[in-house]
């Protein structure tokens, strides 16, 4: 069966670089949503915990429950309130309605909309928000924002940073007014951490950077953690003039030794239609279309590395490395090496 190999040395290297930039392990929230960006949530969570990371963020209660025995401090970013929230977790508040619907006495983080206009409270809503959280005895542990373009060299990042500074000042004033303990602030995602000369928040939230992908090449000297491996199912001699795969997109000009390997778009690979040159990590071309459960190439032995840098496939398909990674099926065996 196909496998995902996780390079432990690379992961530790990346965490070390991130923590150095953030000012310490205690200042880092690792983002483990969507199966740790396809890497395997429990494996990554365990290694991060061993390294000394104490805080993480996930998408949902389901994801939080998966690693609840590993991390004590788990922030759920995309929760829709049910009124039955767990005391084990901290929940992001993404609009005023969430404050009204979430279970009383629940631990929360306020998401602040500083310009992305996806989730979060507007600064003008903070007075009302504090009235609600005080009345409902909600435990305010943190407040944060998300930068919409920290990976682009334009003014958006600086505008949002100033907006968040204003929101922080307002929140601190309201905490004094309502007798509420000062929350932890966090705003810097991976790209923002890379470009920041100074971090004025207590914590940073890093997702893609811990897995080895920088938005600004060389800024943190990160190393990709994941490599994808396929196992040979069969092999044969493809005669000159014969084709392999659906649609006969590849026709051999000479006799060649070909093999079929056990990965396809059913396992989360983007579907290659046989046009253009899509290469494996060893430089060999994928021959013909990728099938649901397999692909073919020149026989490369019992195992072949499909990719060890998601950017290669992202560039070919005109997408981003996140897209390549998060689609990888949870059914693929994952292990640290």
Swiss-Prot record:
Task: Tell me which cofactor or cofactors this protein depends on.
Answer: pyridoxal 5'-phosphate
Tell me its EC number(s), please.
5.1.1.1
Q: What does this protein do?
A: Catalyzes the interconversion of L-alanine and D-alanine. May also act on other amino acids.
Named from the GO MF annotations, one term is:
pyridoxal phosphate binding
- NCBIfam families per record: PRK00053.2-2
Species of origin: Campylobacter concisus (strain 13826)
Q: Any idea what this protein is called?
A: Alanine racemase
N6-(pyridoxal phosphate)lysine modification sites are 33
Q: What gene does this protein come from?
A: alr
Q: Family per UniProt?
A: Belongs to the alanine racemase family.
- The active site is formed by 33 (proton acceptor), 246 (proton acceptor)
């Amino acid at each position: 069966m196909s496998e995902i190999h996780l390079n432990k040395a690379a992961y530790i290297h990346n965490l070390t670089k991130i923590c150095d930039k953030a000012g310490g392990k205690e200042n880092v929230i690792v983002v483990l949503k969507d199966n740790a960006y396809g890497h395997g949530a429990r494996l990554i969570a365990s290694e991060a915990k061993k390294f000394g990371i104490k805080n993480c963020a996930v998408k949902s209660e389901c994801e939080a429950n998966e690693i609840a025995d590993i991390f004590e401090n788990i922030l759920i970013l995309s929760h829709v309130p049910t009124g039955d929230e767990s005391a084990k977790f901290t929940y992001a508040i993404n609009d005023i309605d969430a404050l009204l619907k979430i279970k009383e006495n629940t631990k929360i983080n306020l998401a602040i909309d500083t310009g992305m206009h996806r989730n979060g409270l507007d600064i003008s809503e903070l007075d009302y928000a504090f009235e609600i959280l005080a009345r409902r005895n909600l435990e305010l542990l943190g407040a944060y924002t998300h930068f919409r373009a920290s990976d682009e060299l334009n003014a958006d990042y600086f505008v949002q940073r100033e907006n968040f500074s204003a929101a922080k000042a307002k929140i601190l004033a309201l905490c004094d007014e309502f007798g509420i303990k000062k929350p932890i602030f966090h705003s810097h995602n991976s790209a923002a951490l890379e470009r920041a000369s100074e971090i004025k928040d207590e914590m940073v939230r890093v997702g893609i950077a811990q897995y080895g992908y920088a938005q600004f090449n060389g800024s943190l000297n990160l190393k990709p953690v994941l490599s994808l491996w396929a196992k040979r199912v069969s092999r044969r001699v493809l005669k000159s003039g014969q084709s392999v795969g659906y649609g006969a997109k590849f026709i051999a000009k000479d006799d060649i030794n070909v093999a079929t390997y056990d990965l396809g778009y059913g396992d989360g690979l983007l579907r290659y239609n046989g046009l253009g040159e899509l290469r494996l990590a060893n430089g060999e071309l994928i021959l013909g279309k990728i099938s649901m459960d397999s692909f073919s190439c020149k026989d490369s032995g019992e195992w072949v590395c499909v990719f060890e840098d998601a950017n290669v496939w992202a560039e070919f398909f005109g997408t981003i490395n996140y897209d390549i990674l998060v689609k990888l099926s949870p059914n693929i065996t994952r292990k640290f090496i």
